Amino acid sequence: VEQKKIDTRRRRYMNRQVYNPFLPLNEYIPDGEPHVWGDRVYHYGSHDKEGGYTFCMQDYVVYSAPVKDLTNWRFEGITYRASQDPAYPELKYMYAPDVVRGNDGRYYLYYCMGGDYGYGGYTGPISVAVCDTPAGKYEYLGHVQYKDGTVMKKYICFDPAAMNDDGTIRIFYGTQYGYEE
């Protein structure tokens, strides 16, 4: 009986649509990470599909606006698709990304993927893609690694936040239980 109540609440929750006041009504970007580069604000985040059966599905999109006019948002397009990650081509869910400008002037997209219907089924390390512009087409670069070059896989990490701290790129992330490599 308790499980039935939980399932009913979950279905009711997943059937509600929440709207963002500055995006078109069919667009949803949770886990937002706004960044100012040049004279524009760029809004990164997960991407929910209108009427989708779950969340964080298949791609990332970016919107931007002039710093001095946050009522004038522009759709920059799809910047990265799940299918571009060669390590996990079968995974469809892309969670809470972040972008940082590197010391070389390029932009680095940090993200994690999963395959368990958007309910925290994280299955791999944090990945990174790179682009020459904040809202261009990002290309897969690899996985986050330790200084010795080994992929950071001791823990299942998710929702990376990245920053450039006076030339040192720092990544903060959530984690679940560890697993053996």
PLM-predicted stretches and their roles:
Residues 2-181:
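Carbohydrate-active catalytic/glycan-binding domains of CAZyme proteins
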